[in-house]
């Protein structure tokens, strides 16, 4: 299970002038993107209207090859759209805005790729195109199904229209929802994300939705929802159990780190063997959600990503710290609560996995971006989590937990790196930790232990 890493999206951002992934997005006025989407999963027809304010008079953007731009305008005046060529599955476009005009309307659409049911767990970790089918549609943030506003982070509002029997979800706050009473009606929903976002995922499916409201100490509420297939929703007690456990995890991590940063959290069933954590939701395969151990492990991992990865953003250029920290505070912490032996067995598993990584696949933790194969998981999850085990042992539980609370308070909705984590732990412990972090972050290998002398007495 992991947060969504978007290599295609990031490759586009790196090509945009003036974009700095490591800057703190909350400190600047962010561009806003408004999308109106119509999708028919049966025919896979997709049409969209985008409203945005480009940062420059000439707006360059890319869309997936299945999508064509049909119109562009400013204040009702039509503009020419120039096709700039292709780059793999991407088509590049350019629009020149009139002087003094900024709010651009783009209309585009096409027929999306059919949902590929042959994808296995490794396949869904690769870059995916926007896909649709009646059993489920997935438009990933890195799938180029909307024009990137020209900045690493932005805010958005998305309105979705679907045929009756289908429902949609987008990470963020559900503003409104209309569920048609008649078979020929249209489902409509609007979502917004006011925090800095680096992409937009859209999911749709024939879901049954259950909702529960929990109150915070501040008086505000959090909405918990399950978006389950009819079969999954009909499983006795399953949806309620997911809602119960989600509440438990939210309360646990709010106490350990700080208040939950969003207004809702949803567990969404998909037709593919996915396990993605996104802001305000987790998107898991329907078959995965049936497994009895998921609520006791993976669910908590995904909930915690709303603090680490989706609450404090990862500076991917300097290494993904969030998977190791989340594995330590979720998966490993659950084993510690089970027993000392269970925790020991997990640590041994990490060591075995690391020892099995071929020498050619070894890389420092500063080079880890996302889990694309087993070797990457052994490093970015196991070795990274072990770093936090050793760090807690070195500075003590009290200083360790104080550092995490400070790190959260300081970097909420900002991009943070390993160096920022190091500073938080140094401040909380009152001791230099450069040597510790250097040896575990910068080196690809592990300590070589040898016996130089041995003796025995009778």
Please provide the spans of the model-predicted regions.
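Extended, low-hydrophobicity, Ser/Thr/Pro/Gly-biased non-transmembrane segments
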Residues: 108-207
């Amino acid at each position: 299970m992991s947060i969504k890493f978007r290599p295609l999206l990031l490759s586009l951002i790196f090509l945009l002038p003036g974009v700095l992934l490591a800057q703190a997005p909350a400190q600047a006025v962010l561009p806003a993107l408004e999308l109106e989407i119509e999708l028919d999963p049966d025919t896979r027809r997709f049409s969209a209207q985008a409203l945005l304010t480009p940062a420059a008079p000439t707006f360059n953007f890319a869309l997936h090859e299945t999508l064509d731009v049909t119109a562009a305008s400013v204040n009702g005046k039509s503009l020419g759209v120039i096709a700039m060529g292709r780059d793999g599955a991407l088509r590049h476009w350019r629009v020149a805005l009139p002087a003094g005009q900024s709010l651009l309307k783009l209309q585009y659409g096409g027929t999306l790729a059919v949902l590929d049911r042959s994808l296995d767990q490794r396949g869904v970790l690769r870059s995916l195109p926007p896909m649709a089918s009646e059993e489920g549609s997935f438009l990933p943030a890195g799938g180029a199904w909307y024009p990137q506003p020209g900045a690493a982070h932005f805010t958005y509002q998305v309105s979705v229209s679907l045929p009756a029997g289908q429902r949609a979800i987008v990470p963020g706050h559900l503003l409104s929802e209309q569920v048609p009473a008649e078979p020929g009606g249209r489902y409509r929903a609007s979502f917004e994300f006011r925090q800095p976002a680096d992409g937009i995922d859209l999911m749709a499916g024939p879901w049954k939705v259950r909702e529960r409201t929990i109150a915070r100490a501040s008086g505000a509420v959090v909405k918990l929802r399950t978006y389950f297939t009819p079969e999954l929703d009909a499983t006795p007690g399953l949806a309620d159990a997911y809602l119960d456990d989600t509440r438990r995890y939210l309360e646990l991590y709010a106490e350990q780190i700080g208040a939950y940063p969003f207004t809702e959290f949803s567990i969404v069933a998909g037709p593919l063997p996915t396990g993605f954590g996104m802001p305000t939701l987790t998107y898991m395969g329907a078959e995965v959600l049936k497994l009895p151990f998921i609520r006791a492990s993976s669910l908590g991992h995904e909930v915690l990503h709303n603090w680490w990865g989706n609450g404090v953003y990862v500076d991917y250029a300097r290494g993904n710290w969030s998977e190791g920290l989340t594995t330590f505070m979720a998966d490993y912490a659950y084993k510690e609560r089970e027993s000392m032996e269970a925790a020991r067995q997990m640590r041994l598993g990490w060591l075995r996995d690391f020892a099995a990584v071929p020498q050619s696949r070894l890389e420092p933790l500063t080079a880890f971006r996302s889990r694309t194969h087993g070797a990457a998981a052994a490093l970015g999850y196991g070795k990274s989590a072990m770093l936090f085990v050793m760090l807690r042992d070195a500075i003590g539980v009290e200083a360790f937990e104080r550092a995490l609370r400070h790190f959260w308070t300081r970097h909420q909705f900002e991009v943070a790196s390993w160096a920022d984590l190091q500073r938080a732990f140094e401040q909380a412990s009152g001791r230099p930790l450069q040597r510790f972090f250097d040896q575990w972050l910068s080196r690809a290998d592990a300590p070589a232990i040898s016996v130089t002398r041995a003796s025995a007495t009778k």
